[in-house]
Swiss-Prot record:
Its main location: nucleus. Residues 804-976 form the Helicase C-terminal domain. InterPro entries: Helicase_ATP-bd, Helicase_C-like, P-loop_NTPase, SNF2-like_sf, SNF2/RAD54-like_C, SNF2_N, SNF2_RAD54_helicase_TF, Znf_C3HC4_RING-type. This is Helicase-like transcription factor CHR28. The keyword Ligase does not apply. It comes from Arabidopsis thaliana. Probable helicase-like transcription factor involved in transcriptional gene silencing. Associates with SUVR2 and contributes to transcriptional gene silencing at RNA-directed DNA methylation (RdDM) target loci but also at RdDM-independent target loci. May be involved in nucleosome positioning to form ordered nucleosome arrays on chromatin. Associates with SUVR2 and functions redundantly with FRG1. Required for the efficient methylation of a broad range of RdDM target loci. Residues 799-808 have a biased composition (Acidic residues). Residues 1-66, 112-194, 293-337, 439-462, 779-808 are annotated as: Disordered. A zinc finger (RING-type) spans 679-718. Residues 46-65, 166-176, 779-798 have a biased composition (Polar residues). Pfam families: Helicase_C, SNF2-rel_dom, zf-C3HC4. It is found in: Nucleus. GO terms for biological process: gene silencing by siRNA-directed DNA methylation.
């Protein structure tokens, strides 16, 4: 066996073992003459140049400028290498090396990622026998038809570029990695952004239309057949993983309910099947080399061996999915990765859908192809990275990733004002100049941890198990979770080490174009993974010329994103046949008492806003302004939500613990709660606000995910204090203790407990509208009649673009509950609200009217949520599910329901769309009716208009609308509009 030779001049460790015969450098056969290889430049790199066949090609310079790409001349090569005995001069940026080393060097370094996947390839004669010495094999030989020799690979490890490794002949343009800096050369020099953009633009030109190539899995892998659009997704994803220059992975942005989960499972099975075939076909010719796809240049390559599943069952205690049997990684893998074991696929998803992923992997994969699966969740999860690396698929939550993986640093040019304005959805003119002081409870241990923030350092003692393995693939489900690149969870996800990276999201843009930067950074999509380049190349053109800027963004996205909506056509037919979805906008009116209350509240809020504007303190009071908006929105649901109704959810444990705190701490914590802060999780003014012992403010529902879950550390930035019920306090609890210490009465705080609503005060115009709908549905279910239950008509003509371009969606002016064709199942309804206080009021109304229901919100444990979903789906007597929009809009499959009611409006219409698609998705057999209940002549009218602006912005970014730019954030003008100033 030849000794290992290190030929890398940067931080790569590139090693090749030849067990059967030496590997020869690539050969270029030539009949009667030799050519200067420096002239073999791709035709698109200049205005006109000679191609491989001698014909003149017209450049794309003008097209570049029209689409916002900078058309700068490419720099010429800097080094020249003479190949003895050949007479050819190879122009290259590769440093001069000895002739003896060149043979080994050329096969590994000179061809590292040398061409984009979409280059057209002219037909060539059959490739010579691989590995056969023919003539002077140590030198290049040019010819009219060029070809390459290559070494065989094992376990899917690539030695040469993808097209070569997969047996495809290469055109002369492929060799320009030797002469052009546009290609990644493995010598530590990055590509110029202009060159990167040329490649991206070239790829976009090749993919102007939706992909149509299909790939199916071999029989016996999936228990369900792939639909046509899923076969197309599989072909596209597999191509991106094996033959992509830009990044190994991408964004699958199909609409909710189109089966992104199944497409991803198919990709996992496809790759593992291909790896097994390569292993069998390699025979005894085994050449181990650095995998050129490893995304981290400073780390050794890691390759996940083929499936290690064995007979058995269980997913971390759950039956039905096979466990790994504990095999060790291959010798070569261990040799290259003494520090970082090679693992399989990591799926990161919200806690509410972890078990749904497990069910999909169990039900959709056949017993013969069963994957070894681990749910990495719970206090008893393994701490051994070698154990973690035994599984084909590992599923975990964003909270665990945020806690275990060292965070990538913030981008360099984040100004304080910009950070806060982007964080809270405000324009860049807003700022906050308040410093947060650490109140109580910060221990020396936690301070030490906070200072230890070496991004990506797996040797960091604070790094968890997830950071101590090298993943073959990382999949972010509901990837919009990382849309804010400044959050801990986004920076932690970017710190994961992986060779392939995927973002799954039906709504990749929710607030601003900046949402995309976080995906680009995670995917390592150069040059846009650098924030300065992202701003210069994408945000700048959009701000200067929205029409051309959005066209460029579409081209940038086309290279890495596949997006289909439910209205997309394939061969003239809908991409999927779903029952129709009807969206009703029902505008009801206040009662006299409610209108009087709202008018007074709106007048006071408008006066306060004008006072801030007159004093020039809008920026400093942005939290108070958002709080005033919150109160106006809540007043549209129920006046009692504004009148400080507090369920005091923190309970007795908190009440006992707060009595033990010093008085100065009580006063400090209460002062924080009363200063109108922002929730550290959802970045909105908190509903049912609570404060932790470490001094951070949350909605009780938001922080409950951490208290009741397994990640019991504070989610606030740079804080790792432990959370429990006895360190979370509500305003009423703190006021009560402070009043007791001061000898004051706290009766004011207790004047709005639940007993108030049990005396008939829990109803409101919206709740009455909900009961009318449910009564109408109950009558339909009992009599199977075809009569329609009518509600109040809408006074607003819906906009034609008010939905997401779904061809099967009808938007009507009046809320009419059309009868659903009976298929033997009961008619069930989901009721969404943003506020748990409103869910409490709806719950009391349902109880009073003897309507069987289940509830799902963020304060419930995962087990309780799962039980509620199962009972709603399977129990025919349970007709209603009341759900928090925060907890129920992601990932859940609720096709048992065919009616959806939205009680209040969210700033982002995509969040509402996600909630609706819990019911309108694959598997639904009945028409789905959606009712959005709003109040006439209130702030909700203006929110509807702002939602429409956001829809236009998203449509412009994706090329789904030919309109121009739209406002993308809450600007000062937006706020003036909302307050009618």
């Amino acid at each position: 066996m030849d000794s290992a030779i290190d030929i890398s001049s940067d931080s790569d460790v590139e090693i090749q073992e030849t067990r059967t015969r030496p590997q020869h450098p690539p050969r270029i056969a030539e009949g009667s003459h030799r050519r200067d290889l420096s002239t073999l430049r791709p035709h698109f790199l200049s205005g006109s140049s000679s191609g491989a066949n001698g014909h003149t090609k017209t450049g794309l310079t003008n097209l570049d400028s029209r689409n916002g790409f900078e058309s700068k001349p490419l720099p010429r090569a800097e080094h020249h290498t003479h190949i003895p005995g050949n007479g050819s001069i190879v122009t290259s940026r590769i440093p001069n090396i000895s002739v003896g080393d060149y043979e080994k060097f050329s096969s590994q370094q000179a061809f590292k990622r040398t061409h984009p996947p979409t280059f057209s390839r002219p037909p060539f004669p059959p490739r010579p026998d691989i590995g056969t010495s023919n003539g002077n094999a140590s030198h290049f030989r040019g010819g009219a038809h060029d070809d390459l020799g290559m070494g065989r690979v094992t376990n899917g490890t690539r030695i040469l570029p993808p097209s070569v490794a997969h047996g495809t002949s290469a055109s002369p343009s492929h060799f320009n990695g030797l002469s052009d800096p546009m290609h990644r050369n493995g010598i530590g020099e990055e590509r110029n952004s202009e060159n990167d953009e040329r490649l991206i633009y070239q790829a976009a030109l090749q993919e102007l239309n939706q992909p149509k190539s299909e790939v199916d899995l071999p029989a016996g892998l999936l228990s369900v057949p792939l639909m046509k659009h899923q076969k197309i997704a599989l072909a596209w994803m597999f191509q991106k993983e094996t033959n992509s220059l830009h990044c190994m992975g991408g964004i699958l942005a199909d609409d909710q309910g189109l089966g992104k989960t199944v497409s991803t499972i198919a990709l996992i099975l496809k790759q593992m099947h291909e790896a097994k075939l390569k292993s069998k076909n390699s025979g005894n010719q085994e050449a181990e080399a650095l995998d050129l796809d490893a995304d981290d240049e400073s780390e050794n390559a890691f390759e996940k061996p083929e499936s290690k599943a064995s007979n058995g069952s269980g997913v971390n205690g759950d039956s039905g999915i096979k466990k790994a049997k504990g095999e060790e990684a291959s010798t070569s893998t261990r040799k290259f990765n003494r520090k970082r074991p090679a693992a399989g696929t990591l799926i990161v998803c919200p806690a509410s859908v972890v078990r749904q992923w497990a069910r999909e992997l169990d039900e959709k994969v056949t017993d013969e192809a069963k994957l070894s699966v681990l749910i990495y969740h719970g206090g008893n999860r393994t701490k051994d990275p070698i154990e973690l690396a035994k599984y084909d698929v590992v599923m975990t939550t964003y909270a665990i990733v945020s806690n275990e993986v060292p965070k990538q640093p913030l981008v360099d040019d984040d100004e304080n004002d910009e950070k806060n304005s982007e964080k809270y959805g405000l324009a860049s003119g807003f700022s906050i100049n308040k410093k947060r002081k650490n109140v109580v409870g910060t221990t020396k241990k936690s301070k030490k941890k906070k200072g230890n923030n070496n991004a990506g350092d797996s040797s960091d003692p604070d790094s968890g198990t997830l950071a101590k393995v090298g993943w073959f693939r990382v999949v972010l489900d509901e990837a919009q979770t990382i849309k804010n690149h400044r959050t801990q969870v986004a920076r932690a996800c970017c710190g994961l080490r992986a060779k392939r990276r995927w973002c799954l999201s039906g709504t990749p843009i929710q607030n601003t174009i900046d949402d995309l930067y976080s995906y680009f950074r995670f995917l390592k999509y150069d040059p846009y993974a650098v924030y300065k380049s992202f701003c210069h190349q994408i945000k700048g053109p959009i701000s200067r010329n929205s029409l051309q800027g959005y066209k460029k963004l579409q081209a940038v996205l086309r290279a890495i994103m596949l997006r289909r909506t439910k209205g997309t056509l394939l061969d003239g037919q809908p991409i999927i046949n779903l029952p129709p979805k009807t969206i009703n906008l029902s505008q009801v009116d206040f009662s006299v008492e409610e209108r009087s209350f709202y008018v007074k509240l709106e007048s006071d809020s408008r006066s306060q806003f004008k006072a801030y504007a007159a004093a020039g303190t809008l920026n400093q009071n942005y939290a108070n302004i958002l709080l005033m908006l919150l109160r106006l929105r809540q007043a549209c649901d129920h006046p009692q939500l504004v009148k400080r109704y507090n369920s005091d959810s923190v309970g007795k444990v908190s009440e006992e613990a707060v009595k033990k705190l010093p008085k100065e701490d009580l006063v400090s914590l209460l002062s924080r709660l009363e200063s109108s802060p922002i929730c550290c999780v959802c970045h909105d003014p908190p509903e049912d606000p609570v404060v932790t012992l470490c001094g951070h403010i949350f909605c009780y529902q938001c922080v409950s995910d951490y208290i009741t879950g397994d990640e019991d550390t504070c989610p606030a930035p740079r804080c790792r204090e432990q959370l429990a019920h006895d360190v979370v306090f509500s305003k009423s609890t703190l006021r009560s203790c402070v009043a007791d210490d001061l000898g004051c009465s706290s009766s004011e705080d207790n004047s709005h407990d639940k007993s108030v609503f049990q005396n008939g005060e829990f109803s409101s115009s919206k709740i009455k509208a909900v009961l009318d709908i449910l009564q109408s549905l109950s009558n339909q279910g009992t009599s199977n009649s075809t009569q329609n239950g009518q509600m109040a008509s809408s006074s607003q003509q819906p906009n034609d673009d008010d939905d997401d371009d779904d061809d099967d969606v009808t938007i009507v002016e009046k809320t009419s509950l059309k009868s659903t064709p009976s298929n033997g199942g009961p008619i069930k309804t989901i009721i969404f609200s943003q506020w748990t206080g409103m869910l409490d009021l709806v719950e009391l109304s349902l109880i009073e009217n003897s309507i069987e229901f289940r509830r799902l919100d963020g304060t419930m444990s995962l087990i309780a949520r799962d039980r509620a979903v199962k009972e709603f789906s399977n129990d025919p007597d349970v007709k209603v599910m009341i759900m928090s929009l925060k907890a129920g809009n992601l990932g859940l499959n609720m096709i048992a329901a065919c009616h959806v009611i939205l009680l209040d409006l969210w700033w982002n219409p995509t969040t509402e769309d996600q909630a609706i698609d819990r019911a309108h998705r694959i598997g639904q057999t009945r028409p789905v009716t959606v009712t959005r209940i709003t109040i006439k002549n209130t702030v909700e009218d203006r929110i509807l208009a702002l939602q429409e602006e956001k829809r236009k912005m998203v449509a412009s970014a994706f090329g789904e609308d030919h309109g121009g730019s739209s406002a993308t954030r809450l600007t000062v003008d937006d706020l003036k509009y909302l307050f009618m100033v």
